[in-house]
């Protein structure tokens, strides 16, 4: 049966894979944009809700936390008969989160809304599973590639509009707009998404609980470590408990009949390469956007910064998204000449160049724009091919699960990067001041550069030809 006919599209859209592909990409863009909506608004959140820099960072961290917990469960649901319901339920949850954030009811309600929005991170493995199961071969690979890129590009797509709305109508206007977009996305998904396969996808409840508790503990340590003290009993105890829970989860999954994530499939070389490079790249590149947003909005009286508006800060991130999509086009056209591993190497080089530029030259807008464009191109290269490495190495029935682990690795990496950059900025605030020192930005950029160099080293290692027959047997294509 052709891929496009594996499910039945409701209504008049049946048999139109181009429409399905467009909706899947739109869902990925919308989910990522909404989940990262707080980034350009952090300084505004601090002012409106009268919270500290560390507290405002929770507008990002809590979305990442709920995304990390929800993604593996949604990924497993995406491999069975509840795939369509999982997509619709996730979009509806995001819609509810947008409405809560749009209500001026205090910081606690705002954070609750952001937590619900974080479920949107789980849409990426769901959309990938739908694409692999329901699109024809000639459209499937390109759609999966674009979905992979939008998970990064979506971070900057809506920033200028968010800045314009916040500047003209206040903090809550962008969330009303996001609620409207979520409602449109829900309507489109209801009209276009195909029916799910008949076979059930059993959710490993025990594995979900162990993984959820372990990830939650780990992310809490990363978020609260600076306030608790990295050597404090609660930080060390929470870290040990999180590691123990995650170790228990691995042991549980290896014995489970229907594991939440089939860990043995993750040992295949292309899958390992995708997850390792995606994790390191995410830790390395993710700090740049919040650093740039805060840097350009800092008053020039502080000795650095441009005193820019929220709108201008959002515009600084637009080159990131444009370059990400441009990279996906370049990757698609060069697919016959360059392997996925080589593309990842090229992406890592561009990422290192972007961070080095921000480290040594950030005195003019054009330097910021150039750094963000290089950052976007590098991310676009890496995240265009990572999903193809995974989907080409696992059975179709494990697509959602395998992609959920990939998304989970990136979400944890984003949390590490967010906590790291926030900690470095807080530590750089001089006594008696409320703004970070310029040196704090340099330190964050320097550490990010070192992490990206590690990502480059890993990508070069995976780009080497395989000579061990035992390893070569784990690199072949998956058989559905």
Say what each PLM segment does.
Residues 1-16, 462-480:
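Intrinsic disorder in cytosolic terminal tails and internal cytosolic loops
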Residues 17-43, 53, 57-63, 73, ...:
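12-transmembrane solute porter fold
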Residues 48-50, 82, 103-109, 169-170, ...:
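Helix-breaking motifs and short loop linkers at transmembrane-helix boundaries and internal kinks
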Residues 68-105:
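Conserved MFS/SLC helix-loop-helix module at the cytosolic interface between two early adjacent transmembrane helices
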Residues 78-82, 135-138, 168-170, 203, ...:
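Membrane-helix interface residues
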Residues 106-114, 366-371:
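Short hydrophobic/alpha-helical segments at membrane-entry points of transmembrane helices
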Residues 116-149:
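Cytoplasmic helix-loop-helix junction between adjacent transmembrane helices
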Residues 167-278, 282-284, 289, 316, ...:
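Hydrophobic transmembrane-helix bundles of small-molecule transporters
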């Amino acid at each position: 049966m052709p891929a496009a006919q594996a499910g039945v599209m409701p209504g008049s859209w049946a048999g139109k894979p181009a429409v399905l592909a467009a909706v899947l990409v739109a869902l990925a863009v919308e989910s990522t944009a909404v989940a990262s909506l707080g980034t350009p608004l952090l300084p505004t959140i601090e002012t409106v809700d009268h919270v500290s820099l560390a507290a405002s960072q929770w507008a990002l961290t809590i979305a990442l936390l709920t995304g990390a917990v929800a993604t593996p469960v949604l990924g497993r649901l995406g491999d069975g008969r509840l795939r369509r319901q999982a997509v619709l339920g996730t979009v509806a949850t995001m819609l509810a989160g947008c409405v809560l954030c749009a209500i001026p009811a205090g910081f606690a309600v705002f954070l609750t809304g952001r937590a619900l929005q974080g479920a949107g991170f789980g849409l990426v493995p769901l959309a990938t599973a739908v694409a692999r199961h329901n699109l024809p071969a000639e459209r499937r690979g390109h759609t999966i590639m674009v979905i992979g890129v939008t998970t990064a590009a979506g971070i900057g797509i809506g920033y200028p509009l968010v800045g314009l709305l916040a500047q003209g109508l206040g903090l809550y206007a962008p969330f009303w707009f996001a609620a409207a977009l979520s409602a449109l996305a829900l309507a489109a998904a209801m009209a276009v998404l195909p029916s799910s396969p008949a076979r059930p996808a059993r959710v490993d409840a025990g594995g979900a609980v162990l993984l959820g508790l372990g990830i939650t503990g780990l992310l809490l340590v990363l978020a609260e470590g600076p306030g608790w003290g990295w050597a404090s009993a609660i930080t060390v105890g929470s870290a040990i408990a999180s590691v123990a829970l995650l170790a228990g989860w691995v042991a549980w999954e290896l014995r489970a009949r229907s594991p939440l994530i089939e860990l043995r499939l993750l040992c295949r070389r292309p899958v390992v390469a995708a997850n390792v490079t995606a994790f390191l790249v995410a830790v390395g590149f993710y700090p740049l956007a919040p650093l740039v947003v805060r840097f350009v909005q800092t008053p020039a009286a502080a000795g650095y910064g441009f005193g820019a508006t929220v709108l201008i800060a959002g515009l600084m991130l637009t080159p990131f998204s444009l370059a990400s999509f441009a990279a996906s086009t370049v990757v698609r056209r060069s697919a016959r000449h360059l392997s996925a591993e080589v593309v990842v190497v090229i992406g890592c080089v561009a990422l290192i160049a972007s961070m080095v530029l921000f480290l040594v030259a950030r005195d003019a807008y054009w330097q910021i724009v150039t750094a963000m464009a290089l950052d976007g191109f590098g991310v676009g290269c890496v995240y265009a091919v990572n999903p193809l490495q995974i989907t080409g190495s696992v059975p179709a029935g494990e697509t959602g699960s395998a992609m959920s682990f990939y998304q989970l690795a990136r979400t944890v990496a984003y949390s590490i990067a967010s906590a790291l950059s926030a900690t470095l900025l807080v530590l750089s605030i001089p006594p008696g001041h409320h703004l970070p020192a310029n040196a704090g930005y340099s330190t964050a950029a320097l550490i990010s550069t070192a992490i990206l160099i590690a990502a480059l080293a890993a990508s070069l290692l995976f780009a080497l030809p395989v000579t061990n027959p035992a390893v070569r047997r784990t690199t072949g294509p998956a058989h559905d």
